[in-house]
Amino acid sequence: MSEREFLRFGDELDVKNCNTSRSFNGLLMAIGGIIGGTAGMLIALIIAGFMNFMSYWFSDKIVLSMYGAREIPYEEAPWLHQIVEELARRANMPKPKIYLVPMEQPNAFATGRGPGHAAVAVTRGILEILDQEELKGVLAHELAHIKNRDVLVATIAATIAGAIGFLANMAQWALFFGGLNRNEEEEGGGFAEMIGAILMIIIVPIIATIVQLAISRSREYFADETGAKICGCPVALARALKKIEEYVMQVPANVNPGTAHLFIENPLKGGGIMELLSTHPSTEKRIQRLCELARKMGQECI
């Protein structure tokens, strides 16, 4: 990919990020309208505004605290900080903070609202199974997400998914207490609203999945390519993805499904319907693309 193509694709991603965020907010308001009419839409609008505000300013703290991550001081792992510093220099971006997640499953993610306010988190497991070249590939992939501002959109998606779940709970309580604006004179309308609320409660998990899938798989492909160019070794990233996938299938992780799309490899991977609805492209396809890039760079693939 030429520099001009790289910049043009980056501009396209900025537009896509904006459109995706608007779509999430619109989806939330539509669900609020179905559940509670005008009042429901107003509540959904307030929730969306609050969630977006929280996502923008506190997304890194929310996600990191969710997984008990702690910041790694330079003195504890100078080699790791040096790797991130070098990669950030190559990517022409500020060095993000580095966090350790006390999780045995090998994985990593990035969070934050932009290059100047971001963090990269690695699990204990990934530090144990990858060599330094492979780890460079993983960290470069996460820096690519930060540079492309994928992290902000992904975090907004996670918070909107949570808000959708909140609205579903509202519908359940409304049904329980008969608070769906029914009265004796409008039994037909009240019945229709009740059926609509029941259907909404049933399909909310499906909608939450669609929200996650809206985080385009092309973002992962582009982050792989950009990360491989940053670290200079597509083969190392390909090896890392292969190792991580093998361990993810064997080592379970206590991960909130609403944040699964933040990780470099789907931490809930398990085949079947979950594989079909995965927020990530298949590892095999990602490796194939990295191998193609490696050959263009004169490297032998795995």
From Swiss-Prot:
GO MF terms listed in the record are: metalloendopeptidase activity; zinc ion binding
**Cofactor binding: number and manner:** Binds 1 zinc ion per subunit.
Q: Which UniProt keywords apply?
A: Cell inner membrane, Cell membrane, Hydrolase, Membrane, Metal-binding, Metalloprotease, Protease, Transmembrane, Transmembrane helix, Zinc
Q: Please name the GO terms of the biological process aspect recorded for this protein, alphabetically.
A: proteolysis
| Localization (cell) | Cell inner membrane
Q: How does it sit in the membrane?
A: Multi-pass membrane protein
Q: Which domain of life is it from?
A: Bacteria
Pfam entry (one): Peptidase_M48
- List the record's Gene Ontology CC terms alphabetically: plasma membrane
- What cofactor does this one take? Zn(2+)
Task: Indicate the enzyme's highest-level EC class.
Answer: hydrolase
State the coiled-coil residue ranges: none
Where do the annotations place Zn(2+) binding? H141, H145, E220
InterPro entries in UniProt = HtpX_protease, Pept_M48_protease_HtpX, Peptidase_M48
Please state the protein's primary subcellular location. Answer: membrane
Q: Which Gene3D superfamilies match?
A: Metalloproteases ('zincins'), catalytic domain (3.30.2010.10)
- Membrane-spanning residues where? 27-47, 151-171, 195-215
Protein EC? 3.4.24.-
List, from the UniProt record, the residues annotated as the active site of this protein: E142
Q: Which family does it belong to?
A: Belongs to the peptidase M48B family.
State what protein this is by name: Protease HtpX homolog
